[in-house]
């Protein structure tokens, strides 16, 4: 991960394009021969910093997009992050068999169906543990699946992921 203007900016939200670019770099920036993302996603064009990364991620199945769009500048949610890392791990032939129980975490019921298996894996693999919160005076963990993901959170999860 790199910052801009000499700053890492850890509290800034990360975008979908930034995470896919990070995963593409982690994969060694493989040659991109399948550019179908340029026609299948109406919001991905040649010449952007993320073009090759999105084309690679789409061709490999790391991303699927939504309704003909990748939404590169949209802020990345925690459930999207779990899905990207899970699919990336599968593409890289990593062990994705770990499963963790997130059902007791605050906001676990807000998790979208597409993200349930990836989130169970991310919790089981120790990548995501939830944020500390207090609910009715009791300490709890908040899964916050639809909350935005900061650059610091992605850096932390990336370090845990690489340690696997």
Q: What are the functions of these language-model segments?
A:
Residues 1-20, 24-51, 60-79, 88-116, ...:
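Feature responds to low-complexity, polar/acidic, surface-exposed segments characteristic
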């Amino acid at each position: 991960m790199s910052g801009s203007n000499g700053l890492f900016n850890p509290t800034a939200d990360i975008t979908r394009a930034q995470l896919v670019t990070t995963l593409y770099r982690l994969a060694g920036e493989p040659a991109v021969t399948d550019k179908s993302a340029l026609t299948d996603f109406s919001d991905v064009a040649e010449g952007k910093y993320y073009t090759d990364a999105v084309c690679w991620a789409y061709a490999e199945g790391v991303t699927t997009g939504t309704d003909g769009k990748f939404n590169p500048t949209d802020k990345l949610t925690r459930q999207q992050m779990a899905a990207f890392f899970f699919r990336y791990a599968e593409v890289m032939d990593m062990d994705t068999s770990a499963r963790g129980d997130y059902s007791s975490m605050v906001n676990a019921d807000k998790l979208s169906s597409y993200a349930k298996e990836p989130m169970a894996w991310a919790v089981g693999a120790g990548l995501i543990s939830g944020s500390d919160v207090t609910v009715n005076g009791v300490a709890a963990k908040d899964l916050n699946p639809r909350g935005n993901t900061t650059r610091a959170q992605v850096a932390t999860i990336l370090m845990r992921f690489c340690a696997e």
